[in-house]
Amino acid sequence: VSGTMEHEDSLGNKGVIQSMGCQWMTAGSGILHKEMPQPSERMLGCQLWVNLPAAKKMVPPAYRDIAPDDIPVVMSDKATVRILSGSHRGIRGTLDNSYVQITYLDVTLPADASWKYNEARDDENLFLYLLEGSLFPEVKQQSAESKGCAILYSVPVPGEDTDEPVEVKAGPEGARFLLLSAPPLKEPIVWGGPIVMNSREELEEAFRELRNGTFIK
């Protein structure tokens, strides 16, 4: 979001993530990396972990960084929407992840402006994560009034009206938030430190490989 970060990893990749840029890393069968903040007036960023399906857990690792100018921007009502992944209003984002179909939008609203999003599929979970300002849903009895708050929208219950859009209004100082949506995998998750697997046995095996120096394939 703001500030500069240097990246280096076990694949030999080196890159600089600039303000308003992003990186996309697929851990897959294993990758070691380090992120090094550089002197900046302000450092603010988000790290989102996307769980891979069990059948894709051991795909080859990969990395790319994306310059700010390579991220599509559209005006949506009064909102400025940066499309990192998925699509919005017919415009596709820079990231095309074939393993998980995720929509990832960076939305900025001016003071007191409203915004409506009705492109989520019926089988998706969706959440909004507030970065700056305050945000008030027009329907759900929730609000995000401080940085780091989230508003969650889950898969509809069968038989319920699924046509209701996500509709929010910014507070008097405006709002900047992330919108993320994807179908739930409905698979077990076992997490330990930097590793996410589907069973305790898989997790323990990964840590054994780390200790034995065989983690990187």
Residue ranges and their predicted role:
Residues V1-K217:
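Jelly-roll (double-stranded beta-helix
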